[in-house]
Design a protein with these regions (language model features):
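Active-site acidic-Proline motif in GNAT/NAT acetyltransferases
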Residues: 98-100, 104, 132-133
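Conserved GNAT acetyl-CoA-binding A-motif
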Residues: 118-129
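Residues forming the Rossmann-fold NAD(P)(H) cofactor-binding site
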Residues: 108
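Conserved beta-strand-loop-alpha-helix junction that forms the acyl-donor binding cleft
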Residues: 128-138, 155-159
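Conserved acetyl-CoA-binding loop of GNAT-fold acetyltransferases
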Residues: 142-150
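Acetyl-CoA-dependent GNAT
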Residues: 3-21, 26-100, 111-113, 117, ...
Length: 173
């Protein structure tokens, strides 16, 4: 079990609810490049669906749809699956920082704090996927130590599955 209050030293982290939908939508809209690559626009309906969407084999209690708050302002959103696709792996379904904070290193600091806590919680690796056609995502996740390990087709285009090991003795796959 994750201790979400330990995921950041600078931000208050809590589970997001439907009451947060408007703030989440505003944060998503501040990242138009991401949605341009998806070929869609963010919507309240999509956000509500994302709050409960699970990969095959994951249980609702494995999902953490979290917000990072600076005061009352939502600064970042994290969709994390505990123990997917294996018990020792955490899966990041979405990590998005308010576009107004872009380029300030906030996202990288939040990711590093997240990875530290996941390692403390016993995870040996973190997986995620991003669009191959999105150079911004490629630069960001590579800069944060994630290595692409495979390509997968997706309705939004080819996705790169990437892994970051939290223990040096593990194989990245």
């Amino acid at each position: 079990m994750l201790h979400i209050e330990r995921l950041s030293r600078a931000y208050r982290v809590r589970r997001l609810t439907e009451e947060d939908t408007a703030q989440i939508l505003a944060l998503c809209r501040s990242n138009p490049l991401y949605y341009r690559h998806c070929g869609t626009e963010p919507s309240e309906a999509d956000i509500r669906q994302d709050m409960t969407l699970l990969p095959p084999g994951a249980a609702p209690e494995d999902k953490y749809f979290l917000g990072y708050f600076h005061g009352d302002r939502l600064a970042a959103v994290l969709d994390l699956i505990d123990g997917y696709p294996s018990a020792e792996t955490a899966y990041i379904g979405l990590f998005m920082v308010d576009g107004r904070f872009s380029g300030q290193g906030i996202g990288s600091r939040l990711v590093e704090e997240l990875l530290e806590e996941l390692k403390t919680a016993g995870f040996s690796r973190v997986r995620l996927a991003y669009q191959k056609a999105n150079p911004q995502s490629t630069r960001y996740w590579t800069k944060n130590g994630f290595q692409p390990v495979e390509e997968k087709p997706h309705p939004y285009g080819t996705m790169l599955v990437a892994v970051r090991n939290l223990s040096f003795s593990e194989n990245p796959c």
